[in-house]
Amino acid sequence: MITDRVSDYLEKIEKSDVNAFIDVNSEKVLKEAEELEKNDDLKNKPLYGKIVAVKSNINVKGYKISCASKTLEKYVGTYDATVVKKLRSQGALIVGMTNMDEFAGGSSGETSCYGPTKNPAALDRIPGGSSSGSAAAVAADLCDMAIGSDTGGSIRNPASHCGIVGFKPSYGVVSRQGLCDLAMSFDQIGPLTKNAEDALVLTNAIKGIDRSDSTSLETPKFEKKDISNYKVGVVKEFMDVTDEKIRNEIEKGIEVFKDMGCKIVDLSYKYIDLALPTYYLINYVEFFSATRKYDGRRYGEFIEEACGEEVLRRILIGKHISEQEFSGKYYKKALQARKSMKKEMLGLFNSADLIVGPTVPKLPHKLGEDLSPMEMYAYDVLTVPTNICGICSGVVRCGNISGVPVGLQIQGAPLEDEKVLSAMIEFEKNY
């Protein structure tokens, strides 16, 4: 019975101490489960009875959509985002809203006004961010699967740290309608799951064109493909910036592709040093623009007065470099760099079907450890190129270091999501 499974998960959530959830409405989800059991029209849908957690920056009617910020602490969603409507239409149940870095501005899960999320795979360490609660909920078996958002690695970073699967679809594959945006030209909604097969199913369920999002695209259903004859690229610069222990685990993962019949191709990406400055300059400007609606008049509090330190830092820098005298010096140059980075990245796919390598260059730090902003941003150096270039990218578990999970990142060209998801599935089977 679906209601029994929901009750089991609710009990686990109640007992859990990882702080994965911000808002859970037991009465609401149990009532929805009872109604679902009576709905014969949904019984053959691919997500029938699946219990899904949703990141707290995606609108779900009747739940707190706080973005883990005091700014929106009292805001309750008045509608379902397009992805949530799609989940429900496929037979899924929403169990609750997950913790996250405030306004998705972080890589650790520590900037939430509700306190940090713990990593279920290593309880004394960060789970990664910003989709910290979604990743932790899946890793701690508090739901079947979860939805997160990825602006510069916010699905893939915590998936790697928590030892689960995460997938960032190509830009436009999934509608962003109902997402509280961090940086609209980077943001993409995607799945966090216990295995790669589920990532394929969940991506198919939520993707598709949406009149409410002009950037959204229609794509054929993604199917599992044979990857045995694929050329798999390994970028030297991605490996060079990665800690040796992680690199060793990733090299073992690369051997798995070789054993599957793939040809390994050595590649070079000369713009790795531009990744963080390009990403963050554009991010700051777009985030500053996105937060102007939080003025304390229409809903919520005035953001500059209510937000945390990292969010305020991004707003103030974004405001500064948006000013006319600085725009040409910083923002326009970042846009030029983005164009060069994208051209170079897309060129790599002329030599390879996929690019594989590390997801994050270092292990997650211990909860409460004091890191400078630049040390924190360094977590993103291998994930932001995906968002800058609009390509797709997934993460699967690839070993561990003293029990702390390591994730292998698999990247594909724009709209080659099917290839990446297929490679994730085959890697998991053969690892």
Swiss-Prot record:
The keyword Protein biosynthesis applies. One of its GO terms (biological process) is translation. The active site is at K55, S130, S154. Gene3D superfamilies: Amidase signature (AS) domain (3.90.1300.10). It catalyses: L-glutamyl-tRNA(Gln) + L-glutamine + ATP + H2O = L-glutaminyl-tRNA(Gln) + L-glutamate + ADP + phosphate + H(+). Keywords: ATP-binding, Ligase, Nucleotide-binding, Protein biosynthesis. SUPFAM superfamilies: Amidase signature (AS) enzymes (SSF75304). The keyword Nucleotide-binding applies. GO terms for cellular component: glutamyl-tRNA(Gln) amidotransferase complex. Its EC number is 6.3.5.7. GO terms for molecular function: ATP binding; glutaminyl-tRNA synthase (glutamine-hydrolyzing) activity. Allows the formation of correctly charged Gln-tRNA(Gln) through the transamidation of misacylated Glu-tRNA(Gln) in organisms which lack glutaminyl-tRNA synthetase. The reaction takes place in the presence of glutamine and ATP through an activated gamma-phospho-Glu-tRNA(Gln). Belongs to the amidase family. GatA subfamily. Heterotrimer of A, B and C subunits. PANTHER family: GLUTAMYL-TRNA(GLN) AMIDOTRANSFERASE SUBUNIT A, MITOCHONDRIAL, TRANSAMIDASE. This is Glutamyl-tRNA(Gln) amidotransferase subunit A. It comes from Methanococcus maripaludis (strain C5 / ATCC BAA-1333). The lineage of its organism: Archaea, Methanobacteriati, Methanobacteriota, Methanomada group, Methanococci.
